[in-house]
Amino acid sequence: MLDLPSSTPFGNLCLKYMKILQTMSYINEKLVLIFLEDINIRTNRSFINSSYLISIDEVVFLLRRITDEIIALLWLLSQWIKSGQCPTKLSIDCIGSALNNKEILSNYLLDYEKFLDDLNHISNAQKHSFINSDLNLIGYDEPVINALRLDRNNLKNFDIQNWEKNHYSISVRYLIKTFNALFNDMKMNIEHLNSQLKIDSKR
């Protein structure tokens, strides 16, 4: 467990980080069920259980939330070191704002820009796209995340002849593998920033 600042305007950062780890543990439990159900569907050629697709959506939602929280934590610590005091506003608090910030993108997230962009679009499509619920697709040979994007729910933004441009399809295995790499890198960055913050506070 990281010994992060326990008293900040945003609460106990150590507890926030612990909640992230607890959520990751829950995601792992859901993933086991998803892959077991996927095997059952293919082995027994059974109908797709609605809970199977909903569970995949839930994993995406939680991974998005964790990623947003890690980005916010990273930015908070970096700004604390830069200004000498804990910020009272999180200007960078999610994937979208991080992707639009050259500093945090180049310093911490550049290797994961494509992954973050995909996760951002997929989670937004699941949350906002009115046509996304029409999708009832599964992967050819493994669990796959599918999302159908419709910007602002305006059909003028959807070309039926080239619908693939609005369709996202990535394997759950790829999502988890890339997220794990991202999390490990972010954890090291947070550890480094936290150590620097402790050194600065003793001066």
Language model features: what each stretch is:
Residues 1-57, 61, 71-203:
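Acidic, Ser/Thr/Gly/Pro-rich intrinsically disordered interaction regions
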